[in-house]
């Protein structure tokens, strides 16, 4: 972990994938953007652009577990996405429990002045990505 400086976090979803950036030195994560996905498949050129721009030392992918800690229906898809990130970009990829991050992200959006329109038009996925990456930083650094 000593050689980790910058991380990208991904909140995987079948229609949208939230992205966040975090720094180990500050222990802080912030939202970056939301990528569109088609049945869980992102535009890999957009992902490649983010990797090239930010040059992360590692990637963290949210693992959607059930409340009792067991894998959810989406867990296997998120793990497959994590493996694809590793295979395409040859970076270490970690998974992190993302339970309740979307719920928390909606609360944070409301605290920032409320939701404008639908969550489809104004998603909270990047906020959720920042929350899961922040959780990983707190647990692992």
Swiss-Prot record:
GO cellular component: cytosol
Keyword line: Cytoplasm, Hydrolase, Nuclease, Ribosome biogenesis
Keyword DNA-binding set for record: no
Enzyme Commission (EC) number: 3.1.-.-
Compartments where found: Cytoplasm
Pfam families: RuvX
UniProt xrefs under CDD domains: YqgF
SMART domains assigned: YqgFc (SM00732)
Recorded GO MF terms: nuclease activity
Tagged with keyword Iron: no
Cited function: Could be a nuclease involved in processing of the 5'-end of pre-16S rRNA.
PANTHER family: POLYNUCLEOTIDYL TRANSFERASE, RIBONUCLEASE H-LIKE SUPERFAMILY PROTEIN (PTHR33317:SF4)
Family, similarity comment: Belongs to the YqgF nuclease family.
Protein name per the record: Putative pre-16S rRNA nuclease
Organism whose genome encodes this protein: Pseudomonas putida (strain ATCC 47054 / DSM 6125 / CFBP 8728 / NCIMB 11950 / KT2440)
Taxonomic lineage of the native organism: Bacteria, Pseudomonadati, Pseudomonadota, Gammaproteobacteria, Pseudomonadales
């Amino acid at each position: 972990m000593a050689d980790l400086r910058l991380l990208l976090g991904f909140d995987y979803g079948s229609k949208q994938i939230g992205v966040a950036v975090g720094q180990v030195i500050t222990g802080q994560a912030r939202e970056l953007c939301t990528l569109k996905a088609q049945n869980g498949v992102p535009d890999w050129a957009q992902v490649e652009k983010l990797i090239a721009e930010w040059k992360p030392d590692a990637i963290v992918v949210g693992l959607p577990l059930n409340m009792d800690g067991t894998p959810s229906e989406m867990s296997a898809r998120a793990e497959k996405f994590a493996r694809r990130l590793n295979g395409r970009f040859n970076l270490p990829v970690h998974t992190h429990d993302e339970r309740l991050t979307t719920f928390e992200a909606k609360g944070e959006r409301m605290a920032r002045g409320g939701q404008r329109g639908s969550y489809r038009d104004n998603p909270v996925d990047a906020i959720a990505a920042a929350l899961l990456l922040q959780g990983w930083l707190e647990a692992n650094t």
